[in-house]
Amino acid sequence: MAKRITRIAKLEFMAMQAKPGAELASLGINMPEFTKQFNDATKDRAGDVVPVVITAYDDKSFDFILKTTPAAILLKKAAGIEKGASNAKTQTVATISADKVREIAEYKLVDLNANDVEAAMKIIAGTAKNMGIKITGMEETN
């Protein structure tokens, strides 16, 4: 008999720092086993926030899929800022190059709703614009 899915959850943890807690307890999975597997799987991404989609089954087993670090976090790291602008229409908090945007877009491409790097760059540029980050060397589209 096939396992029945009881819940699907989208969570974010720091790489190698998942700990048993309320978020995992509500899923009804084997928390120590999840934290061990997650921490092992994220060894190479130390210091990054790692989104994860956890599928919990009725027999307390689970599967999980690691996603790429959120674009806003990658943009903040590239720009060297703590947070985005409180009013992005009037404030510019940092400037980054189009090359940095391309680098982020190439990394994020697997998780974005884009068919190519140029489309992914537009998505990342939109996130940057909403954070008050200006991009040099990239034409603006409205």
Swiss-Prot record:
<keyword id="KW-0689">Ribosomal protein</keyword>
<dbReference type="InterPro" id="IPR020783">
    <property type="entry name" value="Ribosomal_uL11_C"/>
</dbReference>
<comment type="similarity">
    <text>Belongs to the universal ribosomal protein uL11 family.</text>
</comment>
<dbReference type="InterPro" id="IPR020784">
    <property type="entry name" value="Ribosomal_uL11_N"/>
</dbReference>
<dbReference type="Pfam" id="PF00298">
    <property type="entry name" value="Ribosomal_L11"/>
</dbReference>
<dbReference type="InterPro" id="IPR036796">
    <property type="entry name" value="Ribosomal_uL11_N_sf"/>
</dbReference>
<dbReference type="GO" id="GO:0070180">
    <property type="term" value="F:large ribosomal subunit rRNA binding"/>
</dbReference>
<protein>
    <recommendedName>
        <fullName>Large ribosomal subunit protein uL11</fullName>
    </recommendedName>
</protein>
<dbReference type="InterPro" id="IPR020785">
    <property type="entry name" value="Ribosomal_uL11_CS"/>
</dbReference>
<dbReference type="InterPro" id="IPR036769">
    <property type="entry name" value="Ribosomal_uL11_C_sf"/>
</dbReference>
<dbReference type="Pfam" id="PF03946">
    <property type="entry name" value="Ribosomal_L11_N"/>
</dbReference>
<dbReference type="GO" id="GO:0006412">
    <property type="term" value="P:translation"/>
</dbReference>
<dbReference type="GO" id="GO:0022625">
    <property type="term" value="C:cytosolic large ribosomal subunit"/>
</dbReference>
<dbReference type="GO" id="GO:0003735">
    <property type="term" value="F:structural constituent of ribosome"/>
</dbReference>
<comment type="subunit">
    <text>Part of the ribosomal stalk of the 50S ribosomal subunit. Interacts with L10 and the large rRNA to form the base of the stalk. L10 forms an elongated spine to which L12 dimers bind in a sequential fashion forming a multimeric L10(L12)X complex.</text>
</comment>
<keyword id="KW-0687">Ribonucleoprotein</keyword>
<dbReference type="InterPro" id="IPR006519">
    <property type="entry name" value="Ribosomal_uL11_bac-typ"/>
</dbReference>
<keyword id="KW-0694">RNA-binding</keyword>
<keyword id="KW-0488">Methylation</keyword>
<keyword id="KW-0699">rRNA-binding</keyword>
<dbReference type="InterPro" id="IPR000911">
    <property type="entry name" value="Ribosomal_uL11"/>
</dbReference>
<comment type="function">
    <text>Forms part of the ribosomal stalk which helps the ribosome interact with GTP-bound translation factors.</text>
</comment>
